[in-house]
Amino acid sequence: VEGSLVQFETLIMKLAKRSGFFWYSFYGCYCGWGGHGLPQDPTDRCCFVHDCCYGKVTNCNPKTATYSYTEENDGIVCGGDDPCKKQVCECDRVAAMCFRDNKDTYDSDKYWKLPPQKCQEDPEPC
């Protein structure tokens, strides 16, 4: 794993104060690789929106593009001259803030390693 996925983990650590790999890799229908069905709770919706955001990125691979950002007032400001990499940074920044803002509804007992049959509904559009 390199590039943006490592940076995404860093942004989650900075903003949500927890490990993205540990807390969000196998959660709900959309957190982790792939995604199917309907988002199960607000945290899973963060991942759904992040997947949709990555799907709209053009001219670079969002999973490997390395972007630049600065930390300002306990927040993240995406920078750099490459519009594609800046878009990837914004996807990651918004998702990390979403994780932070939805910690109180995170339910590992209910949604951690959710069986695939729970994610069979027709997905909603991005």
UniProtKB/Swiss-Prot annotation:
Any matching Pfam family: Phospholip_A2_1
Amino-acid positions noted as binding Ca(2+) in the UniProt annotation, renumbered to this chain: Y30, G32, G34, D51
UniProt superkingdom: Eukaryota
Protein known as: Acidic phospholipase A2 S1E6-b
EC annotation from Swiss-Prot or TrEMBL: 3.1.1.4
Tissue-level expression: Expressed by the venom gland.
PROSITE patterns attached to this UniProt entry: PA2_ASP, PA2_HIS
Originating organism: Calloselasma rhodostoma (Malayan pit viper)
Family stated for the protein in its record: Belongs to the phospholipase A2 family. Group II subfamily. D49 sub-subfamily.
